[in-house]
Design a protein with these regions (language model features):
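Glycine-rich, basic loop-to-helix element that forms the pyrophosphate-binding segment
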Residues: 61-77
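Short beta-strand/loop segment that forms part of the nucleotide-sugar
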Residues: 7, 28-37, 57-62, 86-87
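Donor-binding/catalytic cores of nucleotide-activated saccharide
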Residues: 66, 87-217, 223, 232-234, ...
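Membrane-interface aromatic/basic loop that binds lipid-linked glycans or pyrophosphate carriers
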Residues: 260-352
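A conserved acidic beta->alpha catalytic loop
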Residues: 22, 35-45
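Short aromatic/hydrophobic "clamp" motif used to bind/position activated sugar donors
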Residues: 82
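Short, well-formed alpha-helical segments that are part of the catalytic scaffolds
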Residues: 11-27
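Catalytic core of nucleotide-sugar-dependent glycosyltransferases
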Residues: 197-203, 210-239, 248, 252-280
Length: 352
């Protein structure tokens, strides 16, 4: 069996060698590195690695983003299965072959899904919210919507039958969701593994800061992706679970990152959130996710004017969610703000 490893590379000169060194399979394999217009020494490092490893294919392109880079890799892969690896991440020792064994011994398995851990090189912590899929079992999306908890490209081995799928190139936030959900829907069986197979090297603060800085465009991307995924999903259970995954675990924390940084309620913020809430009403959604978004906005922000609160209150009333009048809001809700912010900050770090 031949394994294709697809690695998008952008300004990863300091980490790409470690990432490639983690590809320790005994299977026949190819590594496809897509240099996405790097402005550091990534290309030089990759050219040197290509001399050292004849099974590395290097593709250079203008900067187009991770989605376009992965799509380029998919177009060039020749393996029976494929996997994705980010240039600053790594496979854990012997885990590629561990996954390959499960793939090869079951004809009905089209995807092998291992666990991802976050942290710094060698100091891995399992992702808290992935507990429901930490088991040795073959599942389908319809019976186990929880697999949408693992919605990124890492830690998975895909059958080559999915090589014609593509990542969304018109968004930069959550661009992997449609690809992953479509593959889950098409797969005959998905083999879950309780073992950590992939290490995500997290740079403290970088993700939070980026999300806060790109808040407006990320909210637009999230809404676009959410609409597409909801159209893909077949049942209310699937759509409600995806709402939890997207609306609560992604969008509400995107909001929280922005509010933690800016700490003031603005019309721009309210317009983004109310647009998103109105869109949620058009699909099945998680009530818990909805109320977390509301809590983040109300108890995380300050300097609410009467006019802004009235806009907010009318939006929620229009979707059947009652809110107190402005004066009761100031007396009953805002005093909870300081206590709530401490709790939300703790939960934020646990959920990441």
């Amino acid at each position: 069996m031949k394994i294709s490893i697809i690695i998008p590379v952008y300004n990863a000169a300091s980490t790409i060698r470690r990432a490639i060194a983690s590809v320790d399979t005994k299977q026949n394999y190819e590594i496809i590195c897509i240099n996405d217009g790097s402005t550091d020494e990534s290309r030089t490092v990759l050219e040197q690695l290509q001399k050292e490893h004849p099974n590395i294919t290097l593709i250079n392109q203008e900067n187009k983003g991770a989605a376009a880079s992965r799509n380029k890799g998919l177009a060039h892969m020749t393996g029976d299965v494929f996997m994705f690896l980010d240039a600053d991440d790594e496979f854990l020792t012997s885990r590629i072959d561990f996954m390959a064994d499960f793939y090869q011994k079951a004809e009905d398995v089209d995807i092998v899904l291992g666990q991802i851990a976050k942290g710094k090189h060698g100091e891995w912590q399992p992702i808290y919210t992935h507990q429901e899929i930490q088991k040795l079992e073959k599942v389908e999306l319809a019976q186990c919507p929880d697999i949408m908890q693992s919605i990124g490209p890492g830690g998975k081995m895909f059958s080559a039958q999915f090589a014609d799928l593509r990542f969304d190139e018109d968004v930069v936030f959550c661009e992997e969701h449609c690809f992953i959900i479509t593959a889950y829907k098409k797969a005959k069986k998905i083999q879950l593994l309780p073992n950590i197979v992939y290490g995500y090297n997290e740079i403290e603060g970088s993700v939070t800061n980026q999300r806060a800085e790109q808040f407006e465009s990320y909210m637009l991307d999230a809404l676009k992706v959410r609409t597409r995924v909801m159209d893909l999903l077949s049942s209310k259970d699937e759509r409600t679970y995806y709402s939890y995954r997207m609306d609560e675990l992604i969008v509400s924390y995107l909001l929280q990152a922005y509010i933690e940084k800016n700490n003031v309620i603005t019309k721009k913020l309210l317009d983004s959130v109310t647009t998103y809430i109105n869109a949620m009403q058009k699909t099945d959604y998680s009530g818990k996710a909805m109320f977390r978004i509301i809590k983040v906005v109300e108890q995380g922000s300050k300097k609410w004017s009467k006019a802004l609160y009235q806009q907010w209150r009318e939006t929620l009333l229009s979707v059947g969610i009652g809110r107190p009048n402005y004066y009761r809001f100031k007396v009953e809700v805002l005093p909870k703000r300081a206590k709530s912010r401490g709790k939300m900050k703790l939960k934020y770090y646990l959920k990441r």
